[in-house]
Design a protein with these regions (language model features):
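Histidine/acidic-residue-rich, glycine-tolerant segments that coordinate divalent metal ions
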Residues: 60-61, 81-83, 88-99, 106, ...
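Acidic/His- and Gly-rich active-site-bordering loop/insert found
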Residues: 2-100, 105, 109-125
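Divalent metal-coordination and catalytic microenvironments
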Residues: 23, 62, 74, 104, ...
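General beta-strand structural signal in soluble alpha/beta enzymes
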Residues: 52-54, 76, 131-133, 157-161, ...
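Short beta-strand-to-loop capping motifs
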Residues: 64, 190-192, 257-259
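Non-cysteine beta-strand/loop elements that form the S-adenosyl-L-methionine
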Residues: 73-75, 186, 343-349
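Metal-dependent amide/peptide-bond hydrolase catalytic core
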Residues: 211-389
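Hydrophobic face of alpha-helices
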Residues: 13, 17, 34-41, 111, ...
Length: 389
């Protein structure tokens, strides 16, 4: 594997890493990314960009305007997770119960690095590079608020990046079409009739109903969806009951459904409702079903994918184009619904021990920081390939 970090990125490597470590040490949740947004805005202003703050509540948009050519948006998310960090790195989180356990600190640092390099090449660019620094990717859909505030106005293409500890340093995961799934959630409340465990005949046992329901829901994936099209229905929580000798009158189930297509997303929801209605009628239980649409599938456009792949290949050679798919969800999908887009993964697991790396959302998550230079280089190369004159 031949990795060629761009010299102009290599020259600011210490700065990129320092920014990432500073943000890692001071993580912020959701839309409350005030310190991070201030750092971003200050650095973009120093680079002489047209900077807008308060976009999508606490997001930052920087425009590098260099002529009448196309406008390309590059996006990074800024928010952390509600996790207590247990690692022992020197830049460990100082905010109790908050941690950058998904790499968004690195995403912000990589995009700031690319912004610095590209701002120094503005006289060679024909077009506009729009840098999108987004809050609240983790579940709150910050992308929608950014879009509502006009961040995609005039944009021709959008690109998003994600560090990924399931791939080793030097690999870039990207594919045409679906790359991330729709991420929906649901709650099912089973209401039966309680009673004594020794005399169950007069009750409607919510535990028994839940057991049949959980089993039946698994047939959606195994018997209703095409086995060549990945889908998931998972029950992650069961709550209810009072004691060993009491028939439970209420059970609450919570779970998630994932699919790569809107068709399968609709199929899952429809079949869940049919199964719930049938089992409720069979056992005489009242069952409430609350299904909440999450992020839609992230679909990479063909032309944007081909451009990204070509640029990434110049940086990591045959390490580019690893056809990685994830059943995770990402609100970059909202950008990709509005304009042609491409989302890609940058491997951040140690090259010599990729299968021992700590995964995202773990309390001692960390990355191979060399991956930051790969990400910045790909962003810069992408703009050079498309807008350089």
């Amino acid at each position: 594997m031949s990795i060629k970090i761009l010299p102009q990125v290599e020259s600011i490597a210490e700065e990129i890493i320092s920014i990432r470590r500073d943000i890692h040490q001071h993580p912020e949740l959701g839309f409350e990314v005030h310190r991070t947004a201030e750092i971003v805005a200050n650095k973009l202003n120093e680079l002489g960009m047209d900077v807008q703050t308060g976009i999508g509540k606490t997001g930052v948009v920087g425009n590098l305007r260099c002529g009448a050519g196309p406008t390309i948006a590059l996006r990074a998310d800024m928010d952390a997770l509600p996790i207590q960090e247990t690692g022992d790195c020197e830049y460990k989180s100082v905010n109790d119960g908050v941690m950058h356990a998904c790499g968004h600190d690195g995403h912000t640092a990589m995009l700031l690095g690319a912004a610095k390099v590209l701002s120094g090449q503005r006289d060679q660019i024909n077009g506009t590079v729009r840098f999108l620094f987004q809050p609240a990717e983790e579940g709150e859909g910050g992308a929608r608020y950014m879009i509502e505030d006009g961040c995609l106005e005039g944009v021709d293409e959008a690109y998003g990046i994600h560090l990924w500890n399931y791939q080793k340093y030097g690999e870039v995961g990207v594919k045409e079409g679906p790359i991330l799934a729709a991420a929906d959630q649901f709650q099912i409340t089973i209401k039966g009739l309680g009673g004594h465990g020794a005399t169950p005949q007069g009750s409607v046992d919510a535990v028994v109903v839940s057991a049949h329901l959980i089993t039946a829901l698994q047939t959606i994936v195994s018997r209703n969806t095409n086995p060549l099209e990945s889908t998931v229905v998972s029950i992650g929580m069961i709550n209810g009951g009072y004691n060993f000798n009491i028939i439970a009158d209420e059970i609450v189930l919570k779970g998630t459904a994932r699919a790569y297509t809107e068709e399968n997303r609709i199929l899952i929801k429809t079949r869940m409702q049919e199964i719930i209605d049938g089992i409720g009628q069979t056992f005489g239980a009242a069952i409430e079903f609350d299904y909440r649409d999450g992020y839609p599938p992230t679909i990479n456009a063909e032309a944007a994918f081909e451009k990204l792949l070509a640029s990434a290949t110049k940086i990591v050679g045959d390490g580019a184009g690893y056809p990685y798919l994830s059943m995770g969800g990402e609100d970059f999908s909202y950008y990709a619904q509005k304009v042609p887009g491409c989302f890609f993964f940058v491997g951040s697991a140690p090259e010599d021990q990729p299968f021992r790396s700590v995964p995202q959302h773990c309390s001692h998550f960390d990355i191979d920081e060399r991956a930051l230079l790969v990400g910045s280089s790909i962003f810069v190369q992408l703009i050079e390939d498309q807008l350089m004159v």
